[in-house]
A protein has these predicted regions:
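Bacterial N-terminal signal peptides
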Residues: 11-22
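Bacterial N-terminal signal peptides that target proteins for export
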Residues: 2-13
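Helix-terminus loop motifs that line ligand-binding clefts
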Residues: 384-398, 424-485, 491, 498-502, ...
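Active-site core of glycosidic bond-cleaving carbohydrate-active enzymes
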Residues: 406-436, 485, 489-493, 502, ...
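Acidic/polar, glycine-enriched structural segments that form the non-catalytic walls/loops
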Residues: 29, 37, 57, 61-71, ...
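Cysteine-centered motifs
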Residues: 15-16, 47, 51
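C-terminal capping/lid segments that line or modulate ligand- or cofactor-binding pockets
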Residues: 116-151, 413, 465, 521, ...
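Active-site acid/base region of carbohydrate-active enzymes
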Residues: 368-377, 430-465, 493-550, 568-590, ...
């Protein structure tokens, strides 16, 4: 039975604490738990009874491994008894890495390994499109826990910000009174398995025990995760374990309890914690059970040398944003998982990830590019899910940067690769917008326009959430076009006319009406859009920004095409008139001007170049080349990394594979970090996953090097040049028919 259970205040953090220990016969699956490590979650080592060790101390340096371009990280398969079979290869069981990427390492590897805990640590989230778990540097730790689309406020009068959640996976583990911490572990190795979405922390605790901790955000249960722990005694030891639910210190209205539920005849004790965010008072509820196949773990058991303890923590986190009764729903998820058992939970999780990987990118001749493509796809699949009308913030569920709001990043950068490789997830992203059309209508009316003006920064409400110190929230109106183009492309990909009529058409119609009311007519019969911020956010309040006008043209034409597809009559002539009259400015030498009066200034990110791709308005190769050559040196060297992806894509389509690869490498140099290929917005920008940049480079692989293009007639494959050392690129699971496309060197 449990030794004690109570609410404990430690270091300003409220915890629901359970203490237990046991020896358990070997049982299928390995397990895990986590101790929070950042300022908002309880540090490892607090709330521990009779344990020693110094949380936060650094482990000894361990030799680093494989290189990707100029950086040095390690890529190797995690050792497993008997090996782990995948669809493409049998994973290595060797303890040490076998080769250097770019040399002898195979290009179809699925695992990334870290053994360096002294350098700056760059983690990546383990997520299921709803629940995001961010492993930390400290052993068995979580830096953050987040739910998508759940927001609090930055302050009493601040805009919304994605909320940090409760942590139902917190764990403290002691062996003979020595706590697991940075200073007490050795021979440590972290592994990220991208094939089946698990994260592992494996280490020795002195000469007493070897510990293996695995983390999964369960794909089949959007609000639940599974931590599995295995402790193998190297000598006779006494094991003590404390499982907790922790809450950020500024959360309010705490309520908790422990309740026993019987699954058939087996008793399980479930701890629960209820808390509210500090500003908006959003209710978050967590539940967790620490268990073996025999039920809740008993306390104070000796492990003999050679014996193994295996246990699991099944946790759930639910908010009232998504479910009306989060307190009971959180418990129901845990009860369901206990009934299923860890074997079935993991099997279903892996089967669903196998389905996701039907949409894959395979590169022959460049193991580094293969790993990066897989890492980018892994994060894209991890941060969104089918059947949930939610979109992806620029940093996904890895961080609270940009308040976790939804920008154009979703439609222009992350959505396109998902549209090609997973229509179900793509549908979730467009449904997020269609369900918030009323808010866009309201915003347009507030500023004196007709139709729909979508917020530049959107949260769960669908209203404008951009801080007022940024002009983008007031003037970056191309967001409405971005939304409309994404919706039209969903119809072009799927041909789902019923969806178009019910969901897509209202948005296309309202965005077209917005642009008709937004333009100003000139004496020469052309029309202009004045006072905007374009994709180049360095240029404020300009007239006839290239991308703004270009995206409006495409959105207006999409509305016309949708009306024709649905046999709807009305405003088509007016939409066509505006689309034909909008100005795209050009110089005498044929270079496209970014806006009226542009004089060669440095630009933040690609703007004019987006007219060729993705807008497909500039199609003449000579014109595309002129704009590339003019604007490439004018893009800020420390601007967002997705610009290089767009430039490289267009060079590949122009037949210059070497040039495309050179720009691709430039785009990765700085933002890409080991050991898990975390991708930051700019060089040195924090331990986050910049989903926007990853989406841009996925488009480079799919639409650039493989040449895929979405048209009104469906998918076509355009000629495209490969980098000189690549043999081929294969993109699988494309479109509703799940086709395979190959571009191979002849």
């Amino acid at each position: 039975m449990l030794r004690h259970s109570h609410i404990l205040m430690a270091g300003g953090v409220l915890c629901c604490l359970l203490s237990f220990a046991a020896f358990v016969p070997a049982w299928a699956g390995s397990g895990g738990a986590s101790a929070p490590s950042d300022a908002e979650l309880n540090p490892v080592g607090e709330c521990i009874r009779e344990c020693t060790g110094t949380p936060g101390a650094s482990a000894a340096a361990v030799e680093d491994g494989w290189s990707l371009q100029s950086k040095r990280w390690r890529s190797s398969e995690r050792p497993a008894e008997g090996g782990t079979e995948t669809a493409e290869q049998s994973m290595s069981v060797a303890r040490e890495p076998r080769g250097i990427v770019g040399g002898s390492a195979p290009s179809n590897r699925w695992q990334l390994v870290n053994t360096d805990f002294e350098s700056r640590y760059y983690g990546v989230p383990i997520a299921n499109g709803c629940l995001g778990l961010m492993p930390g540097r400290a052993p068995m730790s979580l830096k953050s826990v987040m739910l998508s689309n759940v927001y609090d406020s930055r302050s009493n009068h601040g805009v919304s910000r994605i909320a940090t959640g409760l942590n139902p996976f917190a764990l403290s583990l002691c062996v003979d009174g020595v706590a697991v911490s940075d200073s007490t572990v050795t021979d440590r190795r972290q592994t990220l398995d991208m094939r089946h979405a698990w994260f592992e922390d494996d280490f020795k605790l002195g000469d007493k025990a070897r510990v293996n901790w695995q983390l999964r955000a369960l794909r089949e249960l959007p609000y639940a995760g599974l931590v599995s722990v295995e402790v193998r005694a190297l000598q006779d030891v006494r094991l003590s374990v404390e499982g907790r639910i922790t809450s950020p210190r500024n959360f309010a209205q705490i309520d908790s309890g422990v309740i026993t539920r019987h699954i058939e005849t087996t008793p399980f004790e479930i701890r629960r914690l209820r808390s509210r965010t500090p500003q908006r008072g959003v209710l978050l509820c967590a539940a967790a059970a620490t268990f073996t196949e025999n039920g809740t773990m008993p306390a104070d058991t000796l492990l003999r040398a050679g014996q193994t303890l295996r246990f699991h923590i099944l946790g759930s986190l639910v908010s009232e944003t998504d479910l009306a009764d989060p307190w009971n729903e959180a418990e129901r998820f845990v009860i369901y998982g206990l009934g299923e058992g860890p074997e079935r939970l993991v099997a279903r999780h892996e089967a669903l990830w196998d389905e996701l990987w039907q949409g894959d990118i395979r590169i022959e001749g460049d193991p580094d590019a293969q790993l990066f493509a897989r890492a980018a796809l892994f994060q894209m699949y991890s941060n969104a899910r089918e059947g949930r009308a939610a979109s992806i913030p620029p940093f996904g569920l890895s961080d609270r940067e940009y308040c976790g709001h939804i920008f154009w990043d979703s439609e222009l950068w992350m959505y396109p690769p998902l549209l090609f490789l997973n229509g179900g997830i793509a549908r979730s992203l467009v449904d997020y917008r269609t369900e918030r059309l009323s808010g866009a209508r309201h915003k347009a009316s507030l500023y004196g326009y007709r139709g729909a003006l979508f917020p530049w920064e959107s949260d769960d409400s669908g209203e404008e959430s951009c801080p007022t110190n940024a002009l983008t929230g007031t003037f970056e109106h191309h967001i409405s076009s971005d939304v409309a183009i994404g919706i039209w492309n969903y119809y072009r990909m799927t041909g789902d006319k019923e969806w178009l009529r019910e969901k897509g058409w209202p948005v296309l119609r309202e965005v077209a009406d917005f642009w008709v009311s937004r333009v100003e007519w000139n004496k020469d019969g052309s029309c202009s859009v004045k006072g905007v911020v374009g994709a180049d956010e360095f240029a404020h309040h300009v007239t006839d920004n290239a991308f703004t006008n270009g995206s409006a043209i495409v959105a207006l034409r999409a509305a016309c095409a949708a009306a024709q597809a649905l046999d709807i009559h009305g405003s088509i002539a007016e939409w066509e008139r505006v689309a034909s009259a909008l100005r795209i400015l050009q110089r005498e030498d044929g270079v496209t001007d970014e806006f009226e009066g542009y004089a060669g200034q440095t630009v933040k990110q690609a703007d004019v170049n987006l007219l060729a791709y993705p807008l497909q308005l500039v199609t003449d190769p000579a014109a595309i080349r002129r704009d590339l050559e003019y604007y490439e040196p004018r893009i800020h060297p420390h601007g967002p990394a997705m610009s290089q992806a767009i430039l490289a894509l267009q060079w590949a389509r122009l037949g210059e594979g070497a040039k495309a690869y050179e720009i691709y490498q430039k785009g990765l140099d700085g933002p890409l970090h080991g050991p898990f290929l975390a991708f930051s917005e700019t060089a040195g920008h924090g331990d986050t996953c910049f989903m926007t940049g990853m989406g841009g480079f996925l488009q480079l692989f799919i639409n650039g090097f493989c040449g895929l293009e979405l048209t009104d007639e469906g998918i076509v494959q355009l000629p495209a040049a490969l980098p000189p050392h690549w043999k081929r690129i294969t993109v699988t699971g494309v479109g509703p028919e799940r086709r395979t496309y190959i571009n191979a060197r002849k």
